[in-house]
């Protein structure tokens, strides 16, 4: 009701902030269910250091990406800057100032939200690449399949994200992009 109520006052669109909170709670519930399942089926302990925290960092960034994706969806930000890899004619949206990126109002600006969503995807991909190199370098055989599945889902999500941008957030591609985020958080 909290989310829907925002669309009943002044305009018919729901608040992108409330939409993202609603979505985030759904993903937290799903993740807790999966986390408990995996903990019950896994009793191995390992030393915590920066490298071993990378999966948690990656998971946090994926959650953040889903929230920013809800902002993109709620603001129809996917319908602007329908080019990739550039946003129009430049890396940074030309309707904005770089300094605006560091203001809280950036989360209410469609072009900046799309910029953040794109760049967070690049960061997630980079951290994934670090993880896969570590897994293969340390020859952790039991993680080969899960890390490869994760990589395929990240690749699927990136391809669907690019297609979503190029199609101006066409409903079928955009819906597949949103659905594959469930696969991503579940992997």
Which functions belong to the PLM regions below?
Residues 1-187:
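Polytopic transmembrane helical bundles with strong interfacial aromatic enrichment
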């Amino acid at each position: 009701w909290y989310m829907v109520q925002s669309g009943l006052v002044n305009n018919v669109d729901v608040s992108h902030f409330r939409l993202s909170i609603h979505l985030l709670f759904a993903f937290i519930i799903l993740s807790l269910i999966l986390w408990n399942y995996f903990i019950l089926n896994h009793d191995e302990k390992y030393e915590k250091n920066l490298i071993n925290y990378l999966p948690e960092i990656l998971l946090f960034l994926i959650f953040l990406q889903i929230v920013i994706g809800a902002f993109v969806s709620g603001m129809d930000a996917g319908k602007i800057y329908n080019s990739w890899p550039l946003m129009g004619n430049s890396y940074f949206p030309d309707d904005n100032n770089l300094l605006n990126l560091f203001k809280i109002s950036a989360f209410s600006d469609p072009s900046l939200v799309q910029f953040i969503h794109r760049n967070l995807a690049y960061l997630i991909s980079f951290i994934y690449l670090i993880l896969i190199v570590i897994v293969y370098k340390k020859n952790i055989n039991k993680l080969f399949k899960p890390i490869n599945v994760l990589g395929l889902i990240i690749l699927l999500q990136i391809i669907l994200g690019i297609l979503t941008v190029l199609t101006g957030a066409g409903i079928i591609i955009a819906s597949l992009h949103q659905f594959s985020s469930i696969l991503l958080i579940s992997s």
